[in-house]
Amino acid sequence: MTEFLAELIGTMILVILGVGVVAGVELKKSKAEGAGWVLVSIAWGLAVMLGAYAAGNVSDAHLNPAVTLGFAAIGDFPWNKVPAYISGQLIGAIIGAIIVYFQYLPHWRETEDKSAKLGVFATGPAVRSYPANLVSEIIGTFVLVLGLLFIGANELAEGLNPAIVGLLIVAIGMSLGGPTGYAINPVRDLGPRIAHAILPIIGKGDSDWSYAFIPIIGPVVGGVYGAFFYSAMFEGNIGAGFWITSVIVIIALIAAFFNEQKRVNQTASS
């Protein structure tokens, strides 16, 4: 098996199980309808764990462009492999979402809520505020990539890495996932969003492309910063990349804060 195929299959499994649990919870007349956020968070952790076990021996199971780019940025992964990895991840995510569509085929007809149908495939903010939504994705993915690196470096985790990473995903989902639904992975959102756009889902509405840049840019920035932060703080490699990404993250935080203050003032004056 090639690394490209391993990333494709691993990401496909991740999306089948992750998007699948959201479908079960959101779609009408599903046996899991209304089961809630805790189930979704746990299932996404298991989805990542099983995807990682599927691909780990071949490709180290990145399954996420934010991970691939973060590792490449600090020299832990060769840049010439990045296109194949990300291509495999995106294709796997699209295929996985299409499989979920067929798994729940009659339930699309039973579900009238367009936002629920889109929510099966793609993330969306609980409160739409692009600067704050971007920061949420940056922080979530920062924690993810930082966690992957310190888990990987810890001898106590040897042999259990995929399971512990799965628990990391559960923790991120429960603690940080509320504002945006925690994409923390560009292809986890983009692949299923493409599937939503092309599939003949009854009464589906639009695919909310105006929001789609948030779960792409946020995870990339957060993932790369998480890698530079680990390299700087844990390994002492404080270079230009760390300072540049630190400035970018600080600017994002300041922009989100002042945008929220502006909205608060507008609400108070209206």
Language-model region placement:
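Membrane-interface helix-loop junctions and terminal tails of multi-pass membrane proteins
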Residues: 1-270
